[in-house]
Amino acid sequence: ADYLLSFDSGKPLTAMVGNASIKGHIFYNSELSGFNFDYQRLHLAEVLEQLATHRDSSAPPTFYVGSTNVDHWLPGFRQHNDLNLTDHKPIASVWIGNRSRISAHYDFPTNIACCAAGRRRFTLFPPDQLKNLYVGPIDVTPAGQPISLVDFNDPDYRRFPKFRQALESAQVVELEPGDAILIPSMWWHY
């Protein structure tokens, strides 16, 4: 925490904050008309303090800061932690949170996800599995991209029967600190 704070710009971040009842699952409300969390403008120190406060809780509230531009919010961080990609200067983002999970989604750019602390499991699906992932509303989304309506931790196969086919094509990897994964453009991931 202190290391990240040493680069803090002091600008507030957008955090997704939910009570313990959502069990870390950033998702829609029951009508699919809104969300099961609130957006809050918090400073990095506040987010990190909340994460530390609830670190050992068996049912913590959810705190999640997603896809936050490193150059804007953590100036100088990149000079000490960048990947040497020769002439390429990709956008560098950071995701910070506790036991939070975003439903399967895709990103337009190819991504490299690096695990700095804790563990992070990724489940990837090739783009041709879109038809088996049951995508939710495209005009109202929790984090920008459409997401799957399937709860991967407790799939309802009666409601989403083709999800079993998607799982047959899934690739799963668990990252630990120092590990990285390349996520190709348009591949669905969770």
Regions found by a protein language model. Give the residues of each.
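N-terminal accessory scaffold of Fe(II)-dependent oxygenases
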Residues: A1-A180, W188-Y190
